[in-house]
Amino acid sequence: RPGPPETVDFPTANIPLPVVDFNFMLPEAPELAVCHSPRKDITEAFTPRDKSQIAIKDPKLFDENNTEIIDLSLIPAGEYAFPLPNGNVISPYGRRRRHHSGVDIKTCANDTIVSAFDGIVRMAKPFAAYGNVIVVRHYNGLETIYSHNSKNLVKPGDRVLAGQPIALTGRTGRATTEHLHFETRINGVHFNPNIVFNMAKRNYVQNVWLYPER
């Protein structure tokens, strides 16, 4: 099946992400309580295409079910880090002149960008409007994207921990100032990072939610 389109600006029709209260689902489907884990069986060996495209599906993520349970409620605080610890959001996710597929976080030039969760680097290279970009595939089923970097500090296949430096802020690609363009994706499809992260408090939202295969 073809993957999602490779652009920074996605049409609004692609953005809805159903957020389901797991406790609400539990009485109707009690088997869900024992069939999920915050750690997923993810694909860790990458093809040349995996290393060169942003929107890539993980063949293991939906290999048994067409709905995936994403559980962030059991992740310890030490296994999460705000990607730009000293930064502030200057442009939110959603509709502006075009649809914005992530959030822009501003700080000084060459500030340290860190991995949000433990994971493995899938892509690290210059890519179109993203400039120098890094994609990290996480064991919780998510991927995070870090772009416009002045310098990438990791390469595909590197295993990274939450809080580990992976890049320096810059303005490579289509950018008017030094900042981090940060995205969250599932199976190649971007969604609002505020579902996962509290940008004002610089921490993550300990939700459990369902995501249907696209």
PLM region spans:
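Polar/charged, compositionally biased leader and regulatory segments
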Residues: 1-92, 204-214
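Catalytic cores of peptidoglycan-degrading enzymes
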Residues: 76-213
